[in-house]
């Protein structure tokens, strides 16, 4: 599984990147049935006129004949990432079940 990061107004140290990769590692259980090619992670920090700094995390996972896409915002980067991983995990599980039931 190949992971690419795209960052805007955010810096990731190796510890945070390692935590993110560890959380994405459980997606590998769907690797055999879905054959993930690439995972793109976009992380940006923007200013909201009422909320202040807002982090936006977008995860795109390329699987054959389908693109799994999740976008999540939050006041904390890791919290938004955790919610996005939960959503992409649910999508991957549903896609795996759909492929298995063919």
Task: Indicate residue ranges for each PLM-predicted region.
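N-terminal, polar/charged subdomain of small-to-medium soluble alpha/beta proteins
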Residues: 1-102
């Amino acid at each position: 599984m190949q992971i690419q990061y795209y960052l805007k107004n955010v810096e990731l140290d190796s510890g945070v990147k390692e935590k993110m990769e560890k959380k994405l590692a459980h997606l590998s259980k769907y690797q055999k049935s879905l054959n993930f090619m690439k995972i793109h992670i976009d992380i940006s920090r923007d200013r909201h006129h009422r909320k202040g700094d807002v982090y936006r995390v977008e995860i795109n996972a390329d699987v054959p004949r389908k693109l799994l896409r999740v976008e999540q915002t939050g006041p904390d980067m890791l919290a938004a990432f955790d919610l996005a991983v939960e959503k992409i995990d649910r999508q991957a599980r549903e896609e795996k079940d759909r492929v298995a039931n063919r």
